């Protein structure tokens, strides 16, 4: 399956089973060698991760400010934060190489921002508890760009 062109026709493919409910989301990801899954979060969610096959580099961060850690703001404020591309402070919590059968547990405030880079064609399975809620910012995925302290201009 690791070289099956059906599963790796794009850089990042996924199969999602969410049954239109807010309780959970099951996702199978296929990530092609050399592809980076961008830095993202799972706000107010826990995620159980298992690498089915392949090899991934993994980096995770913890948000520092309690307000951002739990998306503790109203919808208008959330949209303003996104449109202004407000910087948030996060500290690196983990960096590791993952191999077949490795598991991770992402909690709402620990390792919640993370990214993967595929060292070879890989497949992993996520169980997200609860499911994302696109209409409510408290459980809506957000993508980030890492900026090092020495790159920040006032």
State the predicted function of each range.
Residues 48, 120-134:
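A short hydrophobic beta-strand segment most commonly corresponding to one strand
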């Amino acid at each position: 399956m690791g070289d099956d062109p059906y599963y790796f026709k794009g850089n990042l493919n996924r199969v999602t089973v969410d049954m239109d409910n807010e309780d959970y989301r099951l996702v199978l990801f296929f990530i092609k060698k050399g592809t980076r899954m961008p830095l993202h979060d799972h706000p107010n969610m826990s995620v159980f991760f298992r690498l089915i096959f392949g090899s991934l580099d993994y980096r995770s961060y913890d948000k520092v400010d309690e307000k951002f850690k739990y998306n503790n703001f109203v919808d208008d404020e959330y949209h303003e934060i996104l449109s202004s591309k407000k910087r948030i402070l996060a500290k690196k919590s983990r960096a590791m190489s993952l191999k077949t059968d490795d598991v991770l547990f992402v909690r709402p405030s620990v390792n919640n921002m993370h990214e993967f880079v595929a060292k070879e064609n890989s497949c992993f399975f996520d169980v997200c508890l609860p499911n994302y809620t696109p209409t409510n910012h408290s459980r809506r995925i957000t993508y980030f760009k890492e900026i090092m302290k020495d790159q920040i201009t006032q």
